[in-house]
Amino acid sequence: MATQALEDITERLLIRSQEAILQLDLWIQRQQRSSICQTTDQESLDKLSQQYNQYMSQLNSLYVRSESVRDKLSKEQQRRLITEDNEHQRIEDLVREFQDITLRLNELATVPNEAPNDSPQSQSTRSSLGSFQPRPLKIIERQRLCMVTPSKPPKKSVGFNPINEVDCPSKTNSLPCSPKKQPARNRTLRAAKSHDTGLNKSKKPSSSDTYESFFKNRQRLSLTFFDEMDDEDFDSDQDTIILPNISTPPHVGVTAKGAEFEPLRRYNSHESILSNKPAPSKSLNLGSFSASFFRPSNPTFGTSISNVQVNCHPTVAATMAPSRNGPRISSSKALLSSFIARSDTHTVKENNTNLKHASFMDKFNSSLSTISESFQSKRGRKNKGMNEERISNHNVAQEQKNNMDISVSIEELQDALNTELLF
């Protein structure tokens, strides 16, 4: 589009320039005619000639430039036409070659169909049989190829001539009268199992080397497996016995005067220690210490709003009298019934303390009794009168009844009555 517009513009310029030149020529001719008819001054004629020459030069330059532009445009147009013609010609040539190739392929495809249907056996002659060559076997062909073109290059062997021994005059063996030197015997190196065995002395032995040396010295590793153990002895919990602790507190020895303890049974996994009620101590004998050294007050323990004040007076009943075979132990129901039968109640304040305090008081009282006994044994010789008073006070403390107020709920008492205590 741009080239066509340029061509149109150049053609118009040429036409206009030619028209201007023609108009100037006509105007000059008119002026000449008029000048002939009318007399004019020489100066005016000179001016007119200068203007004429100027206009003519401008018109000539414009004409020349327009012609050059026209020539360039024409050349480009011709070249473009030539290139387009060449491209079209190339495309036509390619199409013709493609058509020729397709025709030849079609001819080749139709050749076997036009062949006669006679079998090759009927057409075979002596010349055809003579020209037949059997195909060689693959093994023979492969062997021939290997011989012609070996896969591996031949090994290059380099031979060295033996070095003659040079006689050295500094040695005695080199003298002409001395015997010849015998050749040294060839020594072979011992084949090592590893490339680094015993060669690198500066290398530190690794941990694997120490393990190997450890097992090499012993030649084997014996392991014992416990798969043949008989686990039937450990199936029942009845046979498992927990012996009493050696370091028993001193207050436990009071109950040892009666019958012997039964061995404790270990609980099974499905049982719970918390399901059983904690068994109280067998006896509440608090007279093992002197009344002058420590006299406990009335401890109270509050559990709930609906508490019942129970006055605990430990007394020896007829059921606790020793029998012929041994000391007789009262049952839990008899003990609890004796606790409930007491009607002396006192109102006390609620105190949320644990029952562990009672066991702590028992241990504390027993420790005080042992301290008082040791104190009496040391100072028995000096103060005999004081020792007799302490013994009398001790007897009085045994005869005196220790009152302990324990506040428990009715539900706990009923549960305790229903549970059987094992001593």
Swiss-Prot record:
<feature type="region of interest" description="Disordered">
    <location>
        <begin position="109"/>
        <end position="134"/>
    </location>
</feature>
<feature type="region of interest" description="VAC8-binding">
    <location>
        <begin position="290"/>
        <end position="380"/>
    </location>
</feature>
<feature type="region of interest" description="Disordered">
    <location>
        <begin position="150"/>
        <end position="211"/>
    </location>
</feature>
<feature type="compositionally biased region" description="Basic residues">
    <location>
        <begin position="182"/>
        <end position="192"/>
    </location>
</feature>
<feature type="compositionally biased region" description="Polar residues">
    <location>
        <begin position="116"/>
        <end position="131"/>
    </location>
</feature>
<feature type="compositionally biased region" description="Polar residues">
    <location>
        <begin position="199"/>
        <end position="211"/>
    </location>
</feature>
<dbReference type="GO" id="GO:0043495">
    <property type="term" value="F:protein-membrane adaptor activity"/>
</dbReference>
<feature type="modified residue" description="Phosphoserine">
    <location>
        <position position="178"/>
    </location>
</feature>
<keyword id="KW-0926">Vacuole</keyword>
<feature type="modified residue" description="Phosphoserine">
    <location>
        <position position="269"/>
    </location>
</feature>
<feature type="modified residue" description="Phosphoserine">
    <location>
        <position position="119"/>
    </location>
</feature>
<feature type="modified residue" description="N-acetylalanine">
    <location>
        <position position="2"/>
    </location>
</feature>
<feature type="region of interest" description="MYO2-binding">
    <location>
        <begin position="110"/>
        <end position="170"/>
    </location>
</feature>
<keyword id="KW-0597">Phosphoprotein</keyword>
<keyword id="KW-0007">Acetylation</keyword>
<comment type="function">
    <text>Vacuole-specific MYO2 receptor required for vacuole inheritance. Binds simultaneously to MYO2 and to VAC8, a vacuolar membrane protein, forming a transport complex which moves the attached vacuole membrane along actin cables into the bud. Once the vacuole arrives in the bud, VAC17 is degraded, depositing the vacuole in its correct location.</text>
</comment>
<feature type="modified residue" description="Phosphothreonine">
    <location>
        <position position="149"/>
    </location>
</feature>
<protein>
    <recommendedName>
        <fullName>vacuole-related protein 17</fullName>
    </recommendedName>
</protein>
<dbReference type="GO" id="GO:0071563">
    <property type="term" value="C:Myo2p-Vac17p-Vac8p transport complex"/>
</dbReference>
<keyword id="KW-0472">Membrane</keyword>
<dbReference type="GO" id="GO:0000329">
    <property type="term" value="C:fungal-type vacuole membrane"/>
</dbReference>
<feature type="modified residue" description="Phosphothreonine">
    <location>
        <position position="248"/>
    </location>
</feature>
<dbReference type="GO" id="GO:0000011">
    <property type="term" value="P:vacuole inheritance"/>
</dbReference>
<comment type="similarity">
    <text>Belongs to the VAC17 family.</text>
</comment>
<dbReference type="Pfam" id="PF17321">
    <property type="entry name" value="Vac17"/>
</dbReference>
<comment type="subunit">
    <text>Interacts with MYO2 and VAC8. Interacts with ATG18.</text>
</comment>
<dbReference type="InterPro" id="IPR035293">
    <property type="entry name" value="Vac17"/>
</dbReference>
